[in-house]
Amino acid sequence: MKSNPAIQAAIDLTAGAAGGTACVLTGQPFDTMKVKMQTFPDLYRGLTDCCLKTYSQVGFRGFYKGTSPALIANIAENSVLFMCYGFCQQVVRKVAGLDKQAKLSDLQNAAAGSFASAFAALVLCPTELVKCRLQTMYEMETSGKIAKSQNTVWSVIKSILRKDGPLGFYHGLSSTLLREVPGYFFFFGGYELSRSFFASGRSKDELGPVPLMLSGGVGGICLWLAVYPVDCIKSRIQVLSMSGKQAGFIRTFINVVKNEGITALYSGLKPTMIRAFPANGALFLAYEYSRKLMMNQLEAY
């Protein structure tokens, strides 16, 4: 059966959702540590200290704070990302004057991923805002920046709507876009280059699960090394805006560098790097295999 664009988009969207779920389930505790260390670098001496304090203060559940919005965020982001990735690949083919079925180069795939990430950022920003606030609620309360309240997804959503209205969910959108667009160029670029390396002249579609996971891990490492300081500023804007009006990206960036130094922009890098390999490896493994399964069923139908 010949695939039409709507069916292809639905397959990419579903496979992206599977990838997003796998990413969260494998990497959530490290993401929680990352956000805590980015937003409150003075409270933690390092990853081990952050883990021990989180466990002593909140218990094991503290590592999984924000898992529900993280799942929603990653499913929404990766569904839109991979659906738009397929569409953007066609745009790149058209701009480059290629046939609709032509294989793109690794650089062209990276460009398509970068374009697709701009659309994904629009659905990611609101859910990531809720996730980041839930993950740092304990620190915000104990530092006196906000009053004690219920630490639930719904309480955070109601607080945002009450204070800022629907547009409040887009605190940090500019920094999210600044992270996503260049970041996903390196993400897809690193992934595709790694797949080309492991394929060694064979078709990339023939790669097994281990090369796929390693390629996904390389893509994740490339993304975070390229844009980590931007992500740090994004986390601060989204979390600290809980206590009142927060400065924009440029002013927040200048304040952090001036008052805390350049190294503050890399707070939480270690858990991010540890998380990048398994989480992004699982993402691409789930995406590629679920997509292949659905494509095979479609062709057999």
UniProtKB/Swiss-Prot annotation:
The reported result of mutating residue 81 to A is:
Reduced ornithine-ornithine exchange. Does not affect substrate specificity
Q: What is the effect of changing residue 224 to A?
A: Exhibits an altered substrate specificity. Favors the transport of L-arginine and L-lysine with respect to that of L-ornithine
Question: Which Pfam family, just one, is annotated for this protein?
Answer: Mito_carr
Gene Ontology biological process terms, A to Z: L-arginine transmembrane transport; L-lysine transmembrane transport; mitochondrial L-ornithine transmembrane transport; urea cycle
Task: Provide the membrane topology annotation.
Answer: Multi-pass membrane protein
Q: What is the effect of changing residue 180 to K?
A: In HHHS; does not affect mitochondrial localization
Q: What is the effect of changing residue 71 to Q?
A: In HHHS; exhibits very low transport activity despite normal insertion in the liposomal membrane
Which disease is noted in the annotation?
Hyperornithinemia-hyperammonemia-homocitrullinuria syndrome: An autosomal recessive disorder of the urea cycle characterized by onset in early life. The acute phase of the disease is characterized by vomiting, ataxia, lethargy, confusion, and coma. Chronic clinical manifestations include hypotonia, developmental delay, progressive encephalopathy with mental regression, and spastic paraparesis with pyramidal signs.
* Protein name per its UniProtKB record: Mitochondrial ornithine transporter 1
Q: What is the lineage of its organism?
A: Eukaryota, Metazoa, Chordata, Craniata, Vertebrata
